[in-house]
């Protein structure tokens, strides 16, 4: 008889095998079993939120058949958040997967039902696909559309377009390679024709390297205006930063603190710059009156370091500022999904009053295994 039970260390080999089968079934090269095993153990058994023993009731789940085969899994990490300054229990889900031949058993539905019935006040995922979204909503959850919007700011538009073409097929890749020497000329023409949109970004704020202590102090202060926000201590925040550094190649992760002319800190940002010039923003934070200048500095910093474009998740509170800085928006997945029985929590999310960045969700955890 099939059953759902908590994930244990002894299950790691089977879950790793399931992960490789589900997420690397189209000929992609999967991470090695040893690397995946280490990843699953570290993430689900040795994170700051699991090792302190305060959230033992919030655990990852497996769907096991009568003969002991694991055919379904949902990874769950407890996180701490504050609702109007009051602590709430949050559970972030990731790697929701079911063995393809077992999907008729409704293992996915049963796993998600069990997850939703847990003791947490808020269930959250920020990297759901279309199928996961359908099941989630069918069981009473909701899509947080405002937190599913991504923004893109082009810095070198011709190179960005060629990058998109090169990813289509081999013929377009060759075509893009032939055109690449012309990119500086095309981008210069675009800068002259549309200087506000494609010109060299200009920065007015002063920058310093963002250290852990400064970030911890900023996290405690800047998001305090949000009704729903993360609650970090030094151990959990530093663990996340260490993981971000591990995932990036040397020099890829940029951490910058910003100050005005009076020396007052007005914001910061963290972004990862890949070898192909794409920058992924993990977190950008700023005071309301200074947020436009924070964006200007981010785009200037990315441009100076050779980025062709920067992208990230939209903070609904600053949608106008992103639009004013000529960012493009898209909302086609991955999806941010929520489930809660607390109307006050749902109201904060629906009103765009939740502080949610790449550090708070699944994105950072799953990056190592893409």
Feature map (PLM): residue ranges:
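"Short basic amphipathic alpha-helical interaction patches in structured regions
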Residues: 77, 87-92, 107-112
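Short acidic, glycine/Ser/Thr-rich loop/turn "cap" segments at secondary-structure junctions
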Residues: 59, 92-100, 118-124
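Acidic/polar helix N-cap motif
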Residues: 8-11, 99
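Conserved acetyl-CoA-binding loop-helix of GNAT-fold acetyltransferases
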Residues: 95-117, 289-301
